[in-house]
Amino acid sequence: MPNKYGLSIVKDFPVKGVNFIDINPLLNNPEYFGPVIDRFCQLIRQNAADYLKKAAIITPQARGFLFASPIAYKLGLPLVCVRKKGKVPNKPYIFHINNEYDSYDMEIDSDLLQQHTHYIYIDDIFATGQTLAGIKEALAKKQKTIILALHLTAVDALKDIRSNTEALKEILSLEVI
């Protein structure tokens, strides 16, 4: 059953015991997608106004790209994409992430990373917080900071096992499932 943004939950996908949040209905409907992008932009203006001239948006592949790209465009902010290992052709900064059902290396273009000190993190789902925590830790090793983290939705059932992300100024989600 879709929620107010058109999201639906697919049980036991991609592995047994994991409930996958399907964002395709949201992406397929401009009447849902447009207001979501507008709301993200509004939250960034409200919660990171002091950083808008010096921050960049950072987002993990691949679903984060779908939200972060139009937001970066609308706000006139640079976009730095975090990719799985082997996808960055120029000077990759490589780090490791463990998430709820996988473990893998991620990478960021070192030249792009060097250009900014403050980041606004955007992703679709806030589940265990492992992706956010891994990127936050990788940035900290390079003296970079995430000042705001935004997610389309947070999985309420996982709030007690989320990674250590309390040092962030704000972690906001448009809704909780």
Describe these PLM feature segments.
Residues 50-61:
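Short glycine-rich phosphate-binding loop at a beta-alpha junction
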Residues 123-133:
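Acidic, divalent-metal-coordinating active-site segment for phosphoryl/phosphodiester hydrolysis
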Residues 1-51, 109-112, 116:
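Active-site-facing substrate-recognition patch
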Residues 3-6, 133-177:
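PRPP-dependent phosphoribosyltransferase catalytic core
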Residues 55-56, 118-120, 148:
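Structural motif
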Residues 77-120:
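Short, glycine/charge-rich flexible loops or terminal/linker lids adjacent to PRPP-binding catalytic cores
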Residues 66-75, 134-137:
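Short Gly/Thr/Asp-enriched flexible loops that form oxyanion-binding sites at enzyme active sites
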